[in-house]
Amino acid sequence: MSIITDVYAREVLDSRGNPTLEVEVYTESGAFGRGMVPSGASTGEHEAVELRDGDKSRYLGLGTQKAVDNVNNVIADAIIGFDVRDQQAIDRAMIALDGTPNKGKLGANAILGVSIAVARAAADYLEVPLYTYLGGFNTKVLPTPMMNIINGGSHSDAPIAFQEFMILPVGAPSFKEGLRWGAEVFHALKKILKARGLVTAVGDEGGFAPKFEGTEDGVETIIEAIEAAGYEAGENGIMIGFDCASSEFYDKERKVYDYTKFEGEGAAVRTSAEQIDYLEELVNKYPIITIEDGMDENDWDGWKALTERLGKRVQLVGDDFFVTNTDYLARGIKEGAANSILIKVNQIGTLTETFEAIEMAKEAGYTAVVSHRSGETEDSTIADIAVATNAGQIKTGSLSRTDRIAKYNQLLRIEDQLGEVAVYKGLNSFYNLKK
């Protein structure tokens, strides 16, 4: 009854109006699962391949008909007949069918869509929530949200090199209250921006993209908004995080961090040592608890030096650096680079490999942050993954745009379903830092 009988993919649109995949999996019993695949704007060079058609006459070359065809005519034939509950076997079969180290033959987007749909169909068959199916009955930790309320870098037209400025309600008593705190700060920030005559249009992830005078101006305006909303900027209230996305402005030939790419003529150009000094200066000055991709994805010496300097005080998250890949994570653990990994399901391409990366991180004392992509859909699977793994942190955008809110609303539902069992750790989610 739990045998897969049909697999079907179609092309749909993501939050940027670009094509992506939606996959449906059906079983003998009538159980059904659907998965939708996100897409990134700033991508690590070591990520699994997102297969696009390349036909410029259709969707500007970004069509996904090849990936759809791979699901309907290649993957479907291979996994029909499998027990939908055997996630690992199905994921391994797809990996073997692809046969490349980066899923470049079938496309990680094709494989991931099936992987998510299979998990959802299995949960439907067993009549349990997805987070329970994926994580068992010890799933109880609601994640501390990283709310990206200022967008810069490749996510907006704002002249700021850092890609994301986030708020984290570490002092909130519950996820529900933390979400409320974040929403109130978001609206306070909008009011402040309007009063300054700055643009309040939002970027890809729902954050504002105003023309600030620089990074410090952005941070200080966020602190002003936190206080205007009635909260404390610090450990007892709301802290701040960055996604520097440094690979986006690292000049490989000159081996410098060239802020002029986003901030224009006269902006800083920093060596690795100067980049670390600058990040430390920001940490000393502001209530910052997490920095993502503070160094370029291939600047291993820089990462190790940054971790040695700040790794006990601040969460140092590897996104482009690790690309949710256990090979890169294992090297980072061995060499003492970073202390946290960003988890993006489409960077690696299957739920099995995603969970392996989270498990490896936790065993090494690294934190794991479950994350969206800038091109999202209404699919809320990452909310369930965050709870299923007791990850303790989620990064899924600002307090606007339905593609972001869908994940927050799913977490509210999960918190309600868990009732008194639900745990919101807040500041304690950063368990590897010295308090």
Swiss-Prot record:
**Protein name (database record):** Enolase
Name the job this protein performs.
Answer: Catalyzes the reversible conversion of 2-phosphoglycerate (2-PG) into phosphoenolpyruvate (PEP). It is essential for the degradation of carbohydrates via glycolysis.
Instruction: Output the GO biological process annotations, alphabetical, semicolon-separated.
Output: glycolytic process
This protein's pathway reads: Carbohydrate degradation; glycolysis; pyruvate from D-glyceraldehyde 3-phosphate: step 4/5
List cofactor names only.
Mg(2+)
UniProt keyword annotation of Transport present: no
For this UniProt entry, what's an example GO CC term? peptidoglycan-based cell wall
Residues engaged in binding (2R)-2-phosphoglycerate: 163, 344, 373-374, 395
Q: List the disulfide bonds.
A: none
